[in-house]
Amino acid sequence: MAIKDKVREREFLLLILCVLVAFALRFYTFDKKSFWLDEIYTIEDSRDDVKGQIKFYKDNPTYLQAPLFFMITHQLYPFTKPERDLRIIPLVFGTLSIPMIYLLAKQFSPSVALPSALSLAFMTYHISLSQDGRSYSLLMFLGMAGLYFFIKHLETSKSGYLLLVALFFSMLFYTSYSSIPFIALSQILWFYKPGEVAKKPTFSSFLILNGLILLFCLPWILFVAINYRGQTIMDPLHLESPGSFGYILYGVLHDWVLHTPLIIASVLLLILFPILSKFRRNAFILLATIVFPIVGVYIFCKLSDFSHFVTSRYFINSMSLFFITLFLSLNALEVKFQTFRRFFRMKFLFIILLIASNLVILPIYYRSEKQDFRGLANYLTGHIRAGDKVIVSPKLYIRGLLYYFGIGLSESRDYLLSQRRVSDDETEYSISLFYKGNKFTVSHSKTYWNRYIAEGNRVWFVVDKKTAKEINKFYPLTLKGYFDGSVLNLVRFPTDVSMYLLLWDPEAPGEKGINMSIE
C-alpha cells in the first residue's frame, strides 16, 4: 500500500510539473503577436454585451459562429490591450486541458493518463490554439469534461453525471456549431464497457441525457428558427472546396502528429488496436468515436454543397480520444510482445518522438507571426501619400488592415465598402480613408487595378506569395515589405499566409526595395 501511495504521489508531482511547463509554454509570447484575420473577427464579435448579441443574432440567425465564446470574452471588454485580453480565455482553458486530459485518460487506463498529458503539454498545435483568440481550446476542454462525466456514468450508473454531461455538451453547442457531430456521434460510447463490474447502461439513461441536451439547446434552436427568413448560410465569397475524405483525414493526422514517420506509426497503431486489444468491442468503439465525426462532416459537406475548407480544428473534441487510443494501442502492443520490454519501452519511445517532433517546430512558431496586419498597417501609415491606391488581394485582407487602421464597424459587424460594377464579371470593393490629411483608397478587384497603373497612380499591393509572383511577371514592382505569417494554424498546421507589400511608383521606377526574393 505504501508503494502504491509513493507511485501516486510521484505521478501527482509529475502532473503538477507538466501543468506548470504547459502553462509556461503557452504563456510565452502569447500577447506579442499581431491578430490574424479570424482573431479580428472574434474581437469584433466580442464587443457586444448579451443584449447586443441577441440583437445581432436576431438580424443574423444564420451567422456561423455560436455566441457563448463572444459573451465570455466580452467580460474583458473594452480590451485595453487587445492582443493580450482576447487570448486570456484560450490561454486559461488551454492550460486546464492538461489536467483534464489526464483525468479523462485515467478513466480508460491509469497507465495512459500521464503520457496523454505529456503529449498535449508539449504539442505545438495545441500551444498555438491556446495562444489564439478563438474558441478551440475552450471547446477541447468542454468536450473532455463532457466525456469524463460520460465515462463516470458508464462506470457507476449514477444519474447525476448525466446532468453534467448534458451541461458540458450543451455549452459545446453554444460555443461552436462545429461540435454538433461530436455531440451526436460520441454517444457511440454508450456501447463502451469501462470495466467488468460496470452495469449495462439503460435506454432510459440515453433518453435522459439526450432529453437534457435538447432541453438546454432548444431555446437557441427556437430563437434561430423564429428569426430565420431565408438568409444565406454561407458567404458567397467563400468558394473553397472541403476536399475528399482522404484529404480531410490526412489533414487531421498531419496536424496532430506533424511528421510523416509519426503519421504512419499512428495509423498503424490505430489499425492494430482492435487486433491486439483484449477488449475488441471497446477498441472498435473508440476508433469509431474518432473517425465517425470526420465521416459525418464529410457527408454533410457533400450533401449540402458546403463551400469552405475543413480543418482539423473542427474535430478538436476528438483529439483527446485520439491520443488516448494511441497509448492504449501501445499498451496492448507491449502486453502482446512482452519480450521486447526488456530492451525498450515502446510507449516511452513514442512519447519521446512526439515531444521531439514538436520541439523542432516550437522555436520557429515562437519567432513567427500569425499574420502581421499590425506591422503592415504601421508601415503603410508611415509611408502613405495623398492619392495613393492600396490594392488588397484576397479581399478578406481589407478587414485586417481596416482594424489596425482604427476604422469602426457598422451595426452589422462589417465594414461599409463601396461596390462598383466595373465589368460584366468583376466588382471593385473600395473604401476611402484619411491619415494625417492624406486621402488614399483601399480596394480589391481582380484586374481593374491595372487601370490605376495606366493612369499613372502610385499603387501599393498587399498580396500573398502566389499573387505577388503573378503580378511581378507583368510589372517591375518594388518589394517594400514582407510581413510574416509562416506558422499559422489555418487549413493545415503550419500554413504560410505571409503578406508581401509591393509598390508601383511612376516617379521612381528604379527604386530599390528590400533585398529579398519572392520564392
PLM regions: where:
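N-terminal hydrophobic targeting signals that begin at the initiator methionine
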Residues: 1-4, 107
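N-terminal membrane topogenic signal
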Residues: 4-15
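Membrane-proximal helix-loop-helix interfaces that form the catalytic/acceptor-binding platform
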Residues: 18-338, 350-518
